[in-house]
Amino acid sequence: MAATSSSPPCNISASSLLLRQPSRSILKVFGLLPPVSRNNRKLGRLTVTRSNLAQDFLGDFGARDPYPEEIASQFGDKVLGCQSTEHKILIPNASVLSLSQLQCSPVSSSQPPLSGDDARTLLHKVLGWSIVDNEAGGLKIRCMWKVRDFGCGVELINRIHKVAEASGHYPSLHLESPTQVRAELFTSSIGGLSMNDFIMAAKIDDIKTSDLSPRKRAWA
Protein backbone atom coordinates (compact mmCIF):
# COMPACT_ATOMS: atom_id res chain seq x y z
CA MET A 1 0.00 0.00 0.00
CA ALA A 2 1.50 3.36 -1.11
CA ALA A 3 2.22 5.88 1.53
CA THR A 4 0.15 8.99 1.34
CA SER A 5 1.77 12.37 1.91
CA SER A 6 -0.10 14.85 3.99
CA SER A 7 0.27 18.60 3.44
CA PRO A 8 1.06 20.77 6.45
CA PRO A 9 -1.87 22.57 7.97
CA CYS A 10 -2.54 26.04 6.62
CA ASN A 11 -3.36 28.65 9.22
CA ILE A 12 -5.15 31.65 7.72
CA SER A 13 -6.33 34.44 9.94
CA ALA A 14 -9.12 36.82 9.18
CA SER A 15 -6.76 39.82 9.37
CA SER A 16 -4.40 38.39 6.70
CA LEU A 17 -7.33 37.88 4.35
CA LEU A 18 -8.56 41.42 4.81
CA LEU A 19 -5.13 42.84 3.98
CA ARG A 20 -5.26 41.12 0.58
CA GLN A 21 -8.40 42.92 -0.65
CA PRO A 22 -10.86 40.13 0.27
CA SER A 23 -13.56 39.05 -2.10
CA ARG A 24 -17.25 39.12 -1.31
CA SER A 25 -17.27 35.38 -0.52
CA ILE A 26 -14.53 35.73 2.13
CA LEU A 27 -16.25 38.72 3.71
CA LYS A 28 -19.47 36.72 3.84
CA VAL A 29 -17.74 33.81 5.64
CA PHE A 30 -16.46 36.05 8.43
CA GLY A 31 -19.66 38.06 8.64
CA LEU A 32 -18.01 41.25 7.42
CA LEU A 33 -20.13 41.79 4.33
CA PRO A 34 -22.16 45.00 4.73
CA PRO A 35 -25.83 44.92 3.90
CA VAL A 36 -26.65 45.63 0.31
CA SER A 37 -29.29 48.25 -0.32
CA ARG A 38 -31.02 48.09 -3.65
CA ASN A 39 -33.05 50.72 -5.41
CA ASN A 40 -35.56 49.52 -7.94
CA ARG A 41 -36.72 51.76 -10.75
CA LYS A 42 -39.33 51.08 -13.35
CA LEU A 43 -38.37 51.79 -16.97
CA GLY A 44 -41.36 50.72 -19.02
CA ARG A 45 -41.71 46.97 -18.52
CA LEU A 46 -38.18 46.60 -17.14
CA THR A 47 -37.11 46.83 -13.52
CA VAL A 48 -33.63 48.30 -13.01
CA THR A 49 -31.92 47.40 -9.72
CA ARG A 50 -29.04 49.54 -8.46
CA SER A 51 -26.86 48.33 -5.60
CA ASN A 52 -25.37 50.72 -3.05
CA LEU A 53 -22.79 48.19 -1.80
CA ALA A 54 -19.74 50.27 -2.67
CA GLN A 55 -21.15 53.41 -1.10
CA ASP A 56 -22.17 51.60 2.10
CA PHE A 57 -18.86 49.72 2.36
CA LEU A 58 -16.63 52.76 1.84
CA GLY A 59 -18.73 55.14 3.87
CA ASP A 60 -19.52 58.78 3.17
CA PHE A 61 -16.46 60.78 2.14
CA GLY A 62 -16.41 64.56 2.08
CA ALA A 63 -16.64 67.59 4.32
CA ARG A 64 -18.89 67.72 7.35
CA ASP A 65 -19.98 70.28 9.89
CA PRO A 66 -17.94 70.39 13.11
CA TYR A 67 -19.34 68.77 16.23
CA PRO A 68 -20.26 70.99 19.22
CA GLU A 69 -17.28 69.63 21.15
CA GLU A 70 -14.94 70.61 18.32
CA ILE A 71 -16.35 74.12 18.21
CA ALA A 72 -15.95 74.43 21.99
CA SER A 73 -12.30 73.40 21.71
CA GLN A 74 -11.68 76.39 19.41
CA PHE A 75 -9.80 74.18 16.98
CA GLY A 76 -9.99 76.92 14.34
CA ASP A 77 -7.57 79.06 16.34
CA LYS A 78 -4.90 76.38 16.11
CA VAL A 79 -4.73 76.01 12.32
CA LEU A 80 -3.01 78.05 9.67
CA GLY A 81 -5.06 80.21 7.32
CA CYS A 82 -8.54 81.63 7.72
CA GLN A 83 -11.09 79.27 9.21
CA SER A 84 -13.98 81.38 7.92
CA THR A 85 -15.46 80.33 4.57
CA GLU A 86 -17.60 83.44 4.15
CA HIS A 87 -17.53 84.67 0.55
CA LYS A 88 -17.17 88.39 0.00
CA ILE A 89 -18.73 89.84 -3.14
CA LEU A 90 -16.58 92.71 -4.39
CA ILE A 91 -17.58 95.28 -6.99
CA PRO A 92 -15.13 94.95 -9.92
CA ASN A 93 -13.04 98.02 -10.60
CA ALA A 94 -12.05 99.47 -13.96
CA SER A 95 -8.79 97.51 -14.10
CA VAL A 96 -10.58 94.14 -14.30
CA LEU A 97 -13.50 95.21 -16.46
CA SER A 98 -13.44 94.64 -20.21
CA LEU A 99 -12.90 97.79 -22.24
CA SER A 100 -16.26 97.27 -23.93
CA GLN A 101 -17.96 97.65 -20.53
CA LEU A 102 -16.47 101.09 -19.96
CA GLN A 103 -17.99 104.36 -21.15
CA CYS A 104 -16.31 107.09 -23.17
CA SER A 105 -15.62 110.26 -21.19
CA PRO A 106 -14.97 113.85 -22.36
CA VAL A 107 -11.35 114.56 -23.28
CA SER A 108 -9.81 117.96 -22.59
CA SER A 109 -7.69 119.55 -25.31
CA SER A 110 -4.95 120.06 -22.72
CA GLN A 111 -4.74 116.33 -22.06
CA PRO A 112 -1.68 114.69 -23.64
CA PRO A 113 -2.25 111.74 -26.00
CA LEU A 114 -1.32 108.23 -25.00
CA SER A 115 2.31 107.30 -25.43
CA GLY A 116 3.36 104.58 -27.80
CA ASP A 117 4.04 102.16 -24.94
CA ASP A 118 0.64 102.76 -23.36
CA ALA A 119 -1.07 102.37 -26.73
CA ARG A 120 0.69 99.07 -27.40
CA THR A 121 -0.34 97.81 -23.95
CA LEU A 122 -4.00 98.65 -24.60
CA LEU A 123 -3.78 97.13 -28.06
CA HIS A 124 -3.65 93.66 -26.45
CA LYS A 125 -7.21 94.22 -25.19
CA VAL A 126 -8.75 94.65 -28.66
CA LEU A 127 -8.83 92.23 -31.59
CA GLY A 128 -7.68 92.87 -35.14
CA TRP A 129 -6.58 96.47 -34.58
CA SER A 130 -3.15 97.90 -35.43
CA ILE A 131 -1.36 101.15 -34.58
CA VAL A 132 -0.52 103.46 -37.49
CA ASP A 133 0.56 107.09 -37.86
CA ASN A 134 -2.11 109.70 -38.45
CA GLU A 135 -1.94 112.79 -40.63
CA ALA A 136 -1.25 115.08 -37.66
CA GLY A 137 1.92 113.21 -36.74
CA GLY A 138 0.33 111.27 -33.89
CA LEU A 139 -1.01 107.73 -33.65
CA LYS A 140 -4.30 106.09 -34.55
CA ILE A 141 -5.64 102.53 -34.58
CA ARG A 142 -7.04 100.79 -37.64
CA CYS A 143 -9.09 97.67 -38.31
CA MET A 144 -10.04 96.02 -41.62
CA TRP A 145 -12.96 93.68 -42.37
CA LYS A 146 -13.52 91.43 -45.36
CA VAL A 147 -17.23 91.19 -46.18
CA ARG A 148 -19.26 89.13 -48.63
CA ASP A 149 -20.52 91.88 -50.92
CA PHE A 150 -21.33 95.59 -51.16
CA GLY A 151 -24.58 95.23 -49.21
CA CYS A 152 -22.77 93.52 -46.34
CA GLY A 153 -20.22 96.34 -46.29
CA VAL A 154 -22.96 98.96 -45.97
CA GLU A 155 -24.64 96.91 -43.24
CA LEU A 156 -21.38 96.67 -41.25
CA ILE A 157 -20.88 100.44 -41.47
CA ASN A 158 -24.44 100.98 -40.21
CA ARG A 159 -23.87 98.64 -37.27
CA ILE A 160 -20.64 100.40 -36.31
CA HIS A 161 -22.29 103.81 -36.63
CA LYS A 162 -25.14 102.71 -34.34
CA VAL A 163 -22.69 101.65 -31.60
CA ALA A 164 -20.64 104.83 -32.04
CA GLU A 165 -23.73 107.01 -31.79
CA ALA A 166 -24.62 105.42 -28.45
CA SER A 167 -21.08 106.02 -27.13
CA GLY A 168 -20.59 109.52 -28.53
CA HIS A 169 -17.20 108.66 -30.07
CA TYR A 170 -17.16 108.21 -33.85
CA PRO A 171 -14.60 106.33 -35.92
CA SER A 172 -13.62 107.18 -39.47
CA LEU A 173 -15.33 104.58 -41.68
CA HIS A 174 -14.39 103.78 -45.29
CA LEU A 175 -15.80 101.32 -47.81
CA GLU A 176 -12.54 100.78 -49.65
CA SER A 177 -13.98 98.22 -52.05
CA PRO A 178 -17.28 96.34 -52.40
CA THR A 179 -15.88 93.66 -50.07
CA GLN A 180 -13.63 95.58 -47.67
CA VAL A 181 -14.40 98.00 -44.81
CA ARG A 182 -11.82 100.07 -42.93
CA ALA A 183 -12.27 101.82 -39.57
CA GLU A 184 -9.83 104.22 -37.94
CA LEU A 185 -9.93 105.73 -34.46
CA PHE A 186 -8.09 108.64 -32.86
CA THR A 187 -9.04 111.68 -30.80
CA SER A 188 -8.68 114.77 -32.97
CA SER A 189 -8.84 117.23 -30.05
CA ILE A 190 -5.50 115.96 -28.71
CA GLY A 191 -4.02 114.88 -32.04
CA GLY A 192 -3.50 111.26 -31.01
CA LEU A 193 -4.92 108.31 -29.13
CA SER A 194 -6.96 108.47 -25.95
CA MET A 195 -8.61 105.84 -23.79
CA ASN A 196 -11.87 106.53 -25.64
CA ASP A 197 -10.40 105.15 -28.86
CA PHE A 198 -9.65 101.76 -27.31
CA ILE A 199 -13.01 101.66 -25.52
CA MET A 200 -14.73 102.30 -28.84
CA ALA A 201 -12.57 99.67 -30.57
CA ALA A 202 -13.59 97.09 -27.95
CA LYS A 203 -17.26 97.95 -28.44
CA ILE A 204 -16.83 97.52 -32.21
CA ASP A 205 -15.23 94.12 -31.58
CA ASP A 206 -18.45 93.01 -29.89
CA ILE A 207 -20.50 93.70 -33.04
CA LYS A 208 -21.71 90.55 -34.77
CA THR A 209 -20.04 90.20 -38.19
CA SER A 210 -20.20 86.46 -38.86
CA ASP A 211 -23.30 86.82 -41.06
CA LEU A 212 -21.49 89.42 -43.20
CA SER A 213 -18.28 87.47 -43.79
CA PRO A 214 -17.56 85.72 -47.10
CA ARG A 215 -18.88 82.19 -47.33
CA LYS A 216 -16.24 79.51 -47.12
CA ARG A 217 -15.97 77.25 -50.12
CA ALA A 218 -16.00 73.50 -49.58
CA TRP A 219 -13.73 71.69 -52.00
CA ALA A 220 -14.61 68.11 -52.91
Swiss-Prot record:
Gene3D superfamilies registered for this protein in UniProt: Transcriptional coactivator/pterin dehydratase (3.30.1360.20)
UniProt keyword Transmembrane helix present: no
The UniProt record lists the keyword Acyltransferase: no
Superkingdom assignment: Eukaryota
Predominant localisation class: plastid
Transmembrane annotation, as ranges: none
This protein's GO CC annotations: cell periphery; chloroplast; chloroplast stroma; nucleus; plasma membrane; plastid
Transit peptide (residue range): 1-50
PTM comment: Ubiquitinated by SDIR1. Ubiquitination leads to its subsequent degradation, thus controlling abscisic acid (ABA) signaling. Ubiquitinated by AIRP2. Ubiquitination leads to its subsequent degradation, thus controlling abscisic acid (ABA) signaling during drought stress.
One Pfam assignment: Pterin_4a
UniProt keyword annotations, A-Z: Cell membrane, Chloroplast, Lyase, Membrane, Nucleus, Plastid, Tetrahydrobiopterin biosynthesis, Transit peptide, Ubl conjugation
Catalytic activity: (4aS,6R)-4a-hydroxy-L-erythro-5,6,7,8-tetrahydrobiopterin = (6R)-L-erythro-6,7-dihydrobiopterin + H2O
Compartments it resides in: Plastid, Chloroplast; Cell membrane; Nucleus
The protein, known as: Probable pterin-4-alpha-carbinolamine dehydratase, chloroplastic
